[in-house]
Amino acid sequence: MSQGKIVQIIGAVVDVEFPRDMIPRVYDALKLDENGLTLEVQQLLGDGVVRAIAMGSSDGLKRGMTVSNTGAPITVPVGKGTLGRIVDVLGTPVDEAGPIDTDKSRAIHQAAPKFDELSSTTELLETGIKVIDLLCPFAKGGKVGLFGGAGVGKTVNMMELINNIAKAHSGLSVFAGVGERTREGNDFYHEMKDSNVLDKVAMVYGQMNEPPGNRLRVALTGLTMAEYFRDEKDENGKGRDVLFFVDNIYRYTLAGTEVSALLGRMPSAVGYQPTLAEEMGRLQERITSTQTGSITSIQAVYVPADDLTDPSPATTFAHLDATVVLSRDIASLGIYPAVDPLDSTSRQLDPMVLGQEHYDVARGVQSTLQKYKELRDIIAILGMDELSDEDKLTVMRARKIQRFLSQPFHVAEVFTGSPGKYVALRDTIAGFKAILNGEYDHLPEQAFYMVGSIEEAVEKAKTLN
C-alpha cells in the first residue's frame, strides 16, 4: 500500500504526491491517516501528483499530511444487511443502529451490462395514479423521469409512487437521496417505517449540505446496492425485480458541475461540465434490466427555471422510457398531481402493448385536451357563446377530463384531509371512456375534481345538487 503527502488543497479538491512508481489509478480511494477522510482520485497530473476529490469536509487539512492508497475504488456494503438501514456515500450507517450486518461489499464503479445480457420487457407496472396509468404508462424494468420546476410536486409524486408500488411490490427497493433536503429523507424513512415496509428498503443519502464529492457519488452507491439485489440469484437461478428511486438526478449533474469547475475543466453550455453526457450515460447505462433480473427506476429531475431545453434535463430525456412532466400552469389551476397530459409521454403508449381500448381512450383524452387548448384563446377573447355547439361540447368534456385527472394522494392526506385513492387501471380506462362518450355530460364539472373512480364522481355530484 503506497503512501503520499498532500501538496495542495483547493476547497474539496486535494492534490497528493506519491512515489512515481506507486501512483494510484483514477477512481482509487485514498484514506487520510489522521482522520480517516476518504478521497477519490479524479486526475493524474504527472510527476507523481494525483488530483482527488474529498468525500467529506476538507476543513482542517494541511499540506504534508500522509495519505494512504487503498488500491481499490470506494467499496460499499451490499446485500440483505443493508435493508432497513440508512447509509452515506461510503456505505457507513448514519441511523445510529450499529454496524451493517453483511460481509459482502462491492466497488461503486462497475461496467454497464453488455448488450447481449440486456432484456427488454413490455409488462406494465400499475401505479394507481390515473393520469400516469392512462397517458404515460410505466414498463416493468423501465426508466421513468419525473420532470418539474421548483415546488410543482416531484417529491410528493415520487413518494406516492413509492407508496403505491413499493408497498404492493413484493421485491426490494433502493432509495438514493441525491442532494435533496434532509427533511425529505427523514419523512421518507418514517413513511416506510409506519407502513411496515422498511425491511424491504435500503436508503442511501447525500443531502444538500454535503460536499460535492458526496453528492456526485451517492447515486452510484445506491445503484451498486440495487445492482447487487438484481444480480443475486435465488435457488432457481433467477435474479430479482428491484425498484430504484432517485431524488434528484439534477443534483447529481450539479455536483458534477461543481467538481468539474474545481478540477479546472473548461465549462460548456450554460456552465455545465464538458463531460455531462458521458457522466449521465455512465450512470443511466447501469440502471437497466438483464436476463436475470430487472431494475425499474423512477427518477425525479429538477428543471431549472422550468426550461426543459436546459442541458441537464435534455440529456436525461434520452435515457428514459417514460417522462412525466409536471406543469406549473396545471398546478396553478389546483389540479394535483400537476402532470401535463400533452407533454408527458411513454414508449409503452402503443396498441400492441396496451391493447386497442386503452390506446384509443388515451389518444381520445389527449385530442380532446389539445382541442380545448387551441380553443382557449378564442374563449378568452370572444367568450364561450361564439363557439359552435360541437366545440362547446368538446370544451365541457375537456374540463371534466382535466378535473378527473386530479386525484387525492395517500402521502398528502395529512395536508389535505381527504383520504388517498388508488385507482385500478380498468376503472381508469372505463371512467375516461365514459366521459369521452358523453355518458356524464349531465354532471357538473366540480363533481370530477379530486375523486378516485368515476362512481365517486357520481356520488359527489349528488352532494353538490
Curated annotation (Swiss-Prot):
GO cellular component, one term: plasma membrane
EC number(s) from the headed UniProt entry: 7.1.2.2
Catalytic reaction annotation: ATP + H2O + 4 H(+)(in) = ADP + phosphate + 5 H(+)(out)
Record-annotated membrane-spanning stretches: none
InterPro entries: AAA+_ATPase, ATP-synt_VA_C, ATP_synth_F1_bsu, ATPase_a/bsu_AS, ATPase_alpha/beta_chains, ATPase_F1/V1/A1_a/bsu_N, ATPase_F1/V1/A1_a/bsu_N_sf, ATPase_F1/V1/A1_a/bsu_nucl-bd
Cellular compartment(s): Cell inner membrane
GO molecular function annotations of the record: ATP binding; ATP hydrolysis activity; proton-transporting ATP synthase activity, rotational mechanism
Enzyme class: translocase
Recorded topology in the membrane: Peripheral membrane protein
Gene3D superfamilies: 2.40.10.170, Bovine Mitochondrial F1-atpase, Atp Synthase Beta Chain, Chain D, domain 3, P-loop containing nucleotide triphosphate hydrolases
Binding site for ATP: G148, G149, A150, G151, V152, G153, K154, T155
Principal cellular location given in the protein's record: membrane
Subunit architecture: F-type ATPases have 2 components, CF(1) - the catalytic core - and CF(0) - the membrane proton channel. CF(1) has five subunits: alpha(3), beta(3), gamma(1), delta(1), epsilon(1). CF(0) has three main subunits: a(1), b(2) and c(9-12). The alpha and beta chains form an alternating ring which encloses part of the gamma chain. CF(1) is attached to CF(0) by a central stalk formed by the gamma and epsilon chains, while a peripheral stalk is formed by the delta and b chains.
Function: Produces ATP from ADP in the presence of a proton gradient across the membrane. The catalytic sites are hosted primarily by the beta subunits.
Family note: Belongs to the ATPase alpha/beta chains family.
Protein name from the UniProt record: ATP synthase subunit beta
Species this protein is from: Neisseria meningitidis serogroup B (strain ATCC BAA-335 / MC58)
Gene: atpD
